[in-house]
Regions:
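ATP/nucleoside-binding phosphotransfer catalytic cores, i.e., glycine-rich phosphate-binding loops
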Residues: 2-3, 195, 220-223, 230-297
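Glycine-rich phosphate/pyrophosphate-binding beta-alpha loops
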Residues: 151, 202-217, 276
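Short acidic/glycine-rich loop or secondary-structure boundary segments that cap or lie
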Residues: 155-158, 197, 208-213, 236-239
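Glycine-rich beta-strand-to-loop/alpha-helix junction loops that act as flexible
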Residues: 19, 73-75, 99-101
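Short Gly/Thr/Asp-enriched flexible loops that form oxyanion-binding sites at enzyme active sites
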Residues: 78-91
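ATP/NTP phosphate-donor binding region
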Residues: 1-70, 80
Length: 297
């Protein structure tokens, strides 16, 4: 295959992005120019989002035809929408990847780095696991996928605090400090009827999270397993020590499972990648590893 040949795996590249993000117009124009210069036979489509959740609709529509490479230029939340859009398509040959343009980009940090044009030219793809969360309660059932992590308690409260407090290292640090001071434990009921109180519960498909540091020694998001990082209810100093250890030494090896289930005893916030959702009391929560569910480069 010649250096300018387009690998047959993709019939087009689709760029999905938020046009209102600062500098995005210039970045998309530059990216499109770079792709076409390296791969002149490539068809590039640009799909700007118009509202929250729109990326999911755009990805679903694009994934239903042909063999597209969907590139989300976003943070973890934007990429989550694209991934869920692809999973909404009943049968698809779509391939996904992300270019960082957000606050966390935990998924991008945890994936091997390769030149985008080189990856497209080679056409080499790989399968990765997703986390599938099923919430069942009085309002019915909701199913959603996560590419990186699902967090309860501390993780979503940090996200809410940062959103209110503003972006930037100093503002984020102040927001996290305020969050710790107002953190309340949550209670879960396991399948055997036993209950437990936690300050934090993270189910991780990746080894690193921006606000936690290294949560696991393992970084193998294609083995049908995910890591369970728990912090039972304790004093604030325990939370501070856990956070300090995560950002310095790492939390070490964590238990790996293929599924994790419980019922909420009280309302709790939940963060699915970058999106915060509020889970009502008496909701049955089932998180499973969807092995090799997503094709990526």
């Amino acid at each position: 295959m010649g250096s300018d040949a387009l690998a047959p795996h993709f019939d087009r590249v689709v760029l999905i992005f938020n046009p209102d993000r600062a500098g995005m117009g210039t970045r998309i124009a530059s990216l499109e120019q770079e792709l076409l210069a390296a791969l002149p036979d490539l068809t590039v489509e640009t799909l700007p989002t118009a509202f929250a959740g729109h990326a999911r609709d755009l990805a679903r529509s694009a994934a239903t035809t042909g063999s597209p490479l969907l590139i989300s230029i976003s943070g973890d939340g934007g990429y989550n929408e694209v991934v869920n859009g692809v999973m909404d398509a009943s049968s698809t040959r779509a391939v996904c990847t992300v270019l960082p343009a957000g606050n966390a980009n935990d998924h991008f940090r945890s994936m091997p780095l390769r030149q985008l044009t080189e990856a497209i030219r080679e056409g080499s793809v790989r399968r990765m696991d997703l986390l599938r969360i099923t919430l069942t309660g009085e309002r019915g059932q909701r199913v959603q996928y996560a590419h990186s992590y699902i967090g309860f308690g501390l993780t979503p409260l940090m996200a809410i605090g940062i959103e209110k407090g503003g972006k930037g290292k100093i503002l984020e640090l102040l927001s996290v400090t305020r969050t710790l001071s107002s953190l309340k434990p949550f209670e879960l009921e396991r399948a055997d009827g036993a209950t437990a109180q936690f300050d934090s519960l993270v189910l991780a498909n990746i080894s690193r999270m921006a606000k936690y540091g290294t949560v696991s020694e393992k970084n193998n998001p294609n083995d049908g397993q995910f890591e369970v990082v728990t912090l039972p209810h304790s004093g604030r100093w325990r939370i501070a020590l856990m956070t300090l250890r995560a950002v310095t030494l790492g939390l070490g090896r964590q238990p790996s499972v293929s599924s994790y289930a419980f019922t909420t005893r009280n309302p709790i916030p939940c963060q699915i990648d970058g999106e915060v959702v509020h889970v009502p009391a008496n909701t049955h929560v089932l998180v499973e590893s969807a092995k090799h569910a997503l094709t990526t480069i």
